[in-house]
Amino acid sequence: MNLRTLAAVLLSVASFTLLYGQDYFESSKPGWLEIARSTTPVLHEEILRPVAAVRAVQDPSAFQGWRYESLGTPDFHAKNFKEVGEITLDFGRHITGYFSFHTKVLNNSQDAPVKLKFMFGELPAEMNTPLDPWKGTLSRGWMQDEIVTLTDMDEWVTLPRRMSFRYLRIELLGSSAGFDFAIDDLFFKAVSSAGENQVPLLETCPEEIREIARVSEATLKECMQTVFEDGPKRDHRLWSGDLYLQSLANRYSFRNFELVKHCLYMFAAFAGENGVLWSNVYDFPKWGPQYGSYCLTYCLIWNSTLLEYLKDTGDYQTATDLWKVAKRQIEDAMTYMRPDNIFDINARPVWLFFDHRAGLDVNAMMQAAMIFALKDTYELATMIGCADEVKEYPALVKAMTKAARKAYYDKDKEIVVSGPGAQVSILSQTWMIKAGVLSPKEGRKAIVNALADPETLMPSGPYATHYLIDAMMICGMHEQAREYLVDYWGGMVRKGADTFWECYDPDDDMLTPYSFFPLNSACHAWSCTPTYFIGKYPEVFQK
């Protein structure tokens, strides 16, 4: 069967499914959902209190123009809060969970409600930037400011919303002149399913890299809730692209593989009727996918996550149970293939995410991502004894690799180009290397050439930067990979990060995809992978 015929057959199968409303995995989904529910992790709890009261300082040399100065140990507990008026507290590190506080009347009787405002924030600038009028492209509701009206003092109050923060500002908005009151106690119940680190660093590990590993691990831990969340400040949900990177980092830190299994089954249980996975699944307020959010690159990387899970655990039962889901993702992706073995990104509307970089041409990297997915899926099939079901994959890989080199590799310039404008980007080089389209020698030259060209589109964030370092390691550019990791993630540490950020450009502290930088997550899953590189390659990063 040639590629044109194969694609036509697969497209007809998909069309039949959509036309007649049949659910590809209807008989399997109830069992998958039950496995997902049975593997829901227990959250470990830790009670924390603030370590200092702080004062905001506007400082152009600080990240995003703000920093905090310590005022010492908080001592407001016995004071009349009407005299305190406002206080900002530092809990010492990024934490996720639930906030409780207690108030008491100091004299007379409460004759009117008390109104308090609580502002929780991850970074100093977020805490000190006016939120209104709202400019963000995501919901104003994601910001962690809460107004509480107390009609009955002398009791504990727990805010129902889960918070993710380091700093807390408490403001008195309204009270009666007829009585005084104090906030005499408060605490935070931090939660995570991570457990303890299982992979200690070598004693030879340099302090700078040790600190990067610590922050990386803290980032992953905060995102490990009842699913691998992408960032606990905003969505209580699981993204497939983030899950792949989190599973790699988890291997060299907490080794909580049951959580990976839980997440794989959640995706499968909520697959679309056509058998294709949604890009993300909600964990809260109730389980379910974000309908309509289909990202082909994330569908394909789910297969790689399943493969890596099998390698980590030897859980052949799960891999075999979910094999048909992996196979279906490839079937769907193959409907985008042209007869000349090139992935056609214009075959039908589709979201292909590699980076937030504006103007990024994804033709070359999508060709490579498809090759990489075919390789990983065939390896998965071979490991579970299903290679005969996809015996055409090796030939497809060979044909697509040949087509990729012809269409996208400029032999004279020794670089990968993409699209009608022959765009040069770092990601086009890295994905061609990851897919094995370029040899290590060719890959080294391509990366060097791309980095030397001032017109090259660079990665705009940690997700894409992960793949650059991955490509450098594949090509044997060990020293350059180490330098890049220390420069990039170490740059965040030097700017005060205690967890790694969703968006980071060393030359643009205000970078945001949401038109308002306080919406950015300062603890984000796709930024946790230094611990993967540091753990996997100790001879490069720990000596």
Where would I find each of the regions flagged by the language model?
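Short helix-loop boundary/capping segments at the starts of domains
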Residues: 12, 222-226, 269, 273
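Active-site core of glycosidic bond-cleaving carbohydrate-active enzymes
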Residues: 239-543
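Extracellular/oxidizing-compartment recognition motifs
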Residues: 22-233, 258-259, 279-283, 340
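Bacterial Sec-dependent N-terminal signal peptides
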Residues: 1-22
